[in-house]
Amino acid sequence: MFDIGVNLTSSQFSRDHDEVVARARAAGVHGMLLTGTNLPESQQAQRMASHYSGCWSTAGVHPHDGSSWSPAVAEAIYTLAREPQVVAIGECGLDFNRNFSTPQEQEAAFSAQLALAAELAMPVFLHCRDAHDRFLALLKPWLEKIPGAVLHCFTGSRSEVQECLDLGLFIGITGWVCDERRGLELRELLPAIPAERLLLETDAPYLLPRDLKPRPASRRNEPAYLPHILASVASWRGEETQWLEAQTDANVRTLFGIDVNGV
């Protein structure tokens, strides 16, 4: 079982990294992709990935931090991305929900990271919120030049997921799908995602599955809860949990080049 989205650099994990990783392993999560969202956190994620076996990382700048993009940051991300633990560029994309960075800053950072991924022949770890059309417009010209892409934490519509699938994207599903208030539409479109394009993630410490029992007192999500998401998704798709686990592990190997069975 592989969690493609763990924010282990979050301050919520600052006191118990070792315990979080140990609990994940005990739960059967044998691999994790640690997300980089700006230069310092990308550097920290790479250090953590080199410290913990079965962990890899991304290197990039989240749209919220698009204003931080500069030639110096680009050079540092380029250098970091060549470390063996780094297997994707990102988290990059567009987020027009709150615009912590202006749309123009976000678009510049996103386009630059797509160019970087093409130059390095690396897949991209993508973020899109309230920006679907513009996101795809910027992404499309690069898709033939990069080896693959996953739209992480997908929460969009049926038409949006179909557009992404038509472009060859992998789709990342989180515990959002376990939310009986906000996740029902996503739950209904799960069968529309081909098994060979599906990836699973917790996005920990965020998006604790609402139907998890018992719920942790901290309300903090952890990669140890990925088996709950896996079992839920398999049930709603009408598939055996063990089969879907093997398929999503194979998808990780396909997209990121990670030897999942060697972990």
From Swiss-Prot:
List of residues binding a divalent metal cation: E91, H127, H152
Cofactor: Mg(2+)
Gene3D superfamilies per UniProt: Metal-dependent hydrolases
Keyword Metal-binding: yes
Record EC number: 3.1.11.-, 3.1.13.-
InterPro entries: DNase_TatD-rel_CS, Exonuc_TatD, Metal_Hydrolase, TatD-like
Statement: the UniProt record of this protein carries the keyword Metal-binding: yes
CDD domains, sorted: TatD_DNAse (cd01310)
Domain of life per record: Bacteria
SUPFAM superfamilies for the chain: Metallo-dependent hydrolases
EC main group: hydrolase
Location of this chain's protein in the cell: Cytoplasm
Keywords from the UniProt entry: Cytoplasm, Exonuclease, Hydrolase, Magnesium, Metal-binding, Nuclease
Pfam families from the UniProt entry: TatD_DNase
Gene Ontology terms, MF aspect: 3'-5'-RNA exonuclease activity; magnesium ion binding; single-stranded DNA 3'-5' DNA exonuclease activity
GO CC list: cytosol
Record note on quaternary structure: Monomer.
Family, similarity comment: Belongs to the metallo-dependent hydrolases superfamily. TatD-type hydrolase family. TatD subfamily.
Main function: 3'-5' exonuclease that prefers single-stranded DNA and RNA. May play a role in the H(2)O(2)-induced DNA damage repair.
Name assigned to this protein: 3'-5' ssDNA/RNA exonuclease TatD
Organism: Klebsiella pneumoniae (strain 342)
